[in-house]
Amino acid sequence: MKFMSQIEFYHNLYVSECWQKKKGKIVKRLKKKKLQPQVYVITLSQGEQNQLEFFSSVLLKQSIFEHSKLFVIGIADGYDEALFLVEEIVQDVYQETKSANARQFLLTDQAEYEKKGR
């Protein structure tokens, strides 16, 4: 029996501007691990010592992700757009907290959102 990775999405998901109208469809396809070569996912880093990482959604097909729990912060239209969104995320975090600790801010923000009942 194959286990699917557990993918959770940030309530205020960062999305490339060109994909705003397709966001729901892209998220649904990511949950089903459908191939979307142009989609890059921005996640909290698997190692807690790091903040964010991004990679092509095609990598979600690899067995290393079968038992992984991923918290997706953003979806981007390719590598360059992923770089841009990571910069935007860090700037937003710094503006809110005067710190670059994106991991802590995003997890706390998500927990508060879930506490309010979505």
Predicted regions mapped to residue ranges:
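Negatively charged, low-complexity tracts enriched in Asp/Glu with abundant Ser/Thr
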Residues: 1-30
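Short aromatic-glycine-(Arg/Gly/Cys) micro-motifs in beta-strand/loop hairpins
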Residues: 4, 33-70
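Structural boundary micro-motifs
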Residues: 5-7, 67, 109-111
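Generic secondary-structure transition motif, activating predominantly at the C-termini of alpha-helices
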Residues: 31-34, 90-97
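A short, charged, amphipathic alpha-helix used as a generic interaction element across diverse proteins
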Residues: 67-72, 77-92
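Charge-dense polyanion-binding interfaces
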Residues: 93-118
